[in-house]
Swiss-Prot record:
Protein name in the entry: DNA-directed RNA polymerase subunit Rpo1C
GO cellular component terms listed in the entry, alphabetical order: cytoplasm; DNA-directed RNA polymerase complex
Native organism: Methanococcus maripaludis (strain C7 / ATCC BAA-1331)
Lineage: Archaea, Methanobacteriati, Methanobacteriota, Methanomada group, Methanococci
InterPro entries xref list: DNA-dir_RpoC_beta_prime, RNA_pol_Rpb1_5, RPO1C
Gene that this sequence comes from: rpo1C
GO molecular function: DNA binding; DNA-directed RNA polymerase activity
């Protein structure tokens, strides 16, 4: 039995392409050549596949909600957990799940998993070099002390030469960065810099102090720390903070595998499909970390709903819940009086097309047997042919 023969047999079947390919490969691997056996395997696979399909009229949204919500009650409330990396805190459990479905613009602990190209991933030194290029360095992180000198009427920076060397910087680099950000006269005394302004005063110097501390010298903005970890036969970088757009520009970074837990950032840089995949992955990983297993199709349902308009929207009154077409459905969720008052003032009409609004008015819902209309012929007489 050849692959072409199997493809021909499966050509008009209801199986999806991926399942067809997997089935063909399995039959060839097991070296099943008898045609009647192959036909039986294909028939049984089709029957098994059809049994897994959703029945027409099934309330898939309710099933997805209870399938995710019930395990959610068992999740811990721990906000932080050392996720395999000793010095890195990552939000897990229920707080992380809430962050995902709320489509927060900034997670409480943004982090990136940065994979390296073939040239860099096996060499510790090269991986360390990439980490140094990514890790954000400001003036404060390479200084022993930054203070206001009242006697000399200036801001004094005492540089840590060891820190400068370890981050691949020089005193000249620091001076250049400060000059590019602020109009100051700088006096250089080896590892001590005196920053002077035109009209010095205690108030003016203190006002500039936080700005001097925060001046960016090197690396990617928002990436506070990068940790190198060896996994199997390659080095992987874990960052505290996220900036996927700028990290992709760093030499040695594998842009096809590098990820972030900031879903809105993924949407802005890689698009809505990537954001949808990230929502599914993050929810699955969050549940998996708690030892809970939920069918991915329920998670896909939530992700599809959040991304259906081309932007990631939260599930709640500020997103999907507050944008329903039906007035009664919106009122049933949250802020009841507000929605009813607004609708009556504008003269809205509810067509009663959904589930919630039909339940409110006591009508049958369009689900299960309710989605089928039965037509009766009044002229029909028993025994007569139609």
């Amino acid at each position: 039995m050849q692959m072409a023969d199997l493809e021909k047999k499966l050509e008009n079947s209801v199986l999806p392409p991926l399942l067809k390919r997997e089935l063909s490969e399995k039959i060839l691997k097991e070296e099943i050549s008898e045609e009647y056996l192959v036909d039986e395997i294909i028939s049984e696979t089709i029957r098994a596949y059809e049994r897994t399909l959703v029945e027409p009229g099934e309330a898939v949204g309710v099933v997805a909600a209870q399938s995710i919500g019930e395990p959610g009650t068992q999740m811990t409330m721990r906000t932080f957990h050392y996720a395999g990396v000793a010095e890195l805190n990552v939000t897990l459990g229920l707080p992380r799940m809430i962050e995902i479905v709320d489509a927060r613009k900034e997670p409480s602990t943004p982090t990136m998993t940065i994979y390296l190209n073939d040239e860099f991933k096996g060499d510790r030194e090269k991986a360390s070099m990439v980490a140094k290029n990514i890790e954000s360095t400001d003036v404060e992180s390479v200084s022993e002390d930054i203070s206001v000198d009242l006697i000399n009427e200036c801001i004094t920076i005492v540089l840590n030469m060891h820190q400068l060397e370890s981050r691949g910087l020089t005193v000249a680099d620091v001076i250049e960065s400060i000059k590019s950000k602020m109009k100051l006269k700088i006096e250089d005394h080896e590892n001590v810099l005196n920053l002077k302004i035109k009209t010095p005063s205690l108030k003016a110097l203190r006002k500039r102090l936080p700005k001097v501390r925060a001046i960016h010298l090197k690396g990617v903005q928002n990436i506070k720390r990068v940790i190198i970890r060896k996994e199997v036969d390659e080095y992987i970088l874990y960052s505290e903070g996220s900036n996927i757009k700028e990290v992709f520009d760093i030499e040695g970074v594998d842009t096809t595998k590098t990820t972030t837990n900031n879903i809105v950032e993924i949407q802005d840089v890689l698009g809505i499909e990537a954001a949808r995949n990230a929502i599914i992955y993050e929810m699955d990983a969050t549940l998996g970390n708690q030892g809970l297993t939920v069918d991915k199709r329920h998670l896909m349902m939530v992700a599809d709903l959040m991304c259906t308009d081309g932007v990631v929207k939260p599930i709640g009154r500020h997103g999907i819940g507050g944008e329903k077409a039906s007035v009664l459905a919106r009122a049933a969720f949250e802020e009841t009086v507000k929605h009813l008052y607004s609708a009556s003032m504008r003269g809205y009409v509810d067509e009663l097309g959904g589930v919630v609004e039909n339940i409110i008015v006591g009508k049958p819902i369009a689900m299960g047997t309710g989605c089928i209309d039965v037509c009766i012929d009044k002229k029909y007489e028993e025994g007569k042919e139609l």
